[in-house]
């Protein structure tokens, strides 16, 4: 259904709380994975986000995604389609240990069927 051509993880250890993500760490990770995989940031059309639905974490994550792959830093032009972002957690809730594989399955099926799954608000 799809090929995973790159992945990565990081942890910078510097944020005001254990559950608060770091914009800098997320932005660096998104950029590094593209570079390591030989994919231009402008070629990213969809991001399956962590998207836990927190008031602090989601804005930080979406800002990093927008800066890494979107128009805000000139990665895309004004006439280019936007980067689509979603998270399976809006459909299923947080699966804790299984949430990563559920995200991969959802994204694989979306690519295979060429259809976007709507996010439940």
Regions from the language model: what does each represent?
Residues 1-121:
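Condensing-enzyme catalytic core of the thiolase-fold
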């Amino acid at each position: 259904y799809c090929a995973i051509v790159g992945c990565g993880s990081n942890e910078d250890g510097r944020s005001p709380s254990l559950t608060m993500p770091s914009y800098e760490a997320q932005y660096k990770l998104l950029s590094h994975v593209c570079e390591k995989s030989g994919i231009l940031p402008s070629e990213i059309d969809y991001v399956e986000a962590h998207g836990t639905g927190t008031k602090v974490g989601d804005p930080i994550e979406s800002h990093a995604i927008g800066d890494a792959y979107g128009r805000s830093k000139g990665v895309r032009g004004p006439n280019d389609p936007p980067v689509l972002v979603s998270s399976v957690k809006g459909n299923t809730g947080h699966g804790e240990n299984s949430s990563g594989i559920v995200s991969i399955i959802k994204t694989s099926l979306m690519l295979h069927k060429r259809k976007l799954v709507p996010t439940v608000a």
